Amino acid sequence: FESLKADYYLSLDSENVSQLKVVEKFVAVFPEYDQNRGIERAIPTKYKKNNLDLKIESVQNEYAIDRNYTTYESNDNLVLRIGDADSYVRGRQVYTITYTMRDVITFYDQQDEWYWDVNGDQWRQPFGSVTARIHLAPDLAVSISKQPICFTGSYGQNATDCSVSSAKEGDQTVITI
């Protein structure tokens, strides 16, 4: 993959349940011969004991035109198979996936936590760059008591080869990783 840019819009609903809207933009570069029909994206449907109430809003190309996709479930994930079984993709392709979830914050006695794996650890291809922007609603932004942290590397590693910055954009706090 050339890149992944993800925007996470985190808020609370009227019942104080966390809401998450996600917009992911994957840029894949395929060979110029018939090899690939698209990509698969596995999105979690559960976190710990919580059912995340995942809803796919759209799957589009770089021109906001809907892409064909099918879904299947595997290991507490909804897997999107994006592409056409009858045609190959070549060159640079953009896949923008928009979805929503609920109940993504874990509440503890001393603190609350939103723990998210931006691009997962099951990809066969490397990513040139990965950027995540977390847009916090005002009611959540005021409750941040610690500096957000990020980790990089393979599953189980805890390297921090990444940077974290925070800025105000309108009434939201945006954390960029």
Name these PLM-found stretches.
Residues F1-I177:
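Lumenal/extracellular ectodomains and adaptor appendage modules
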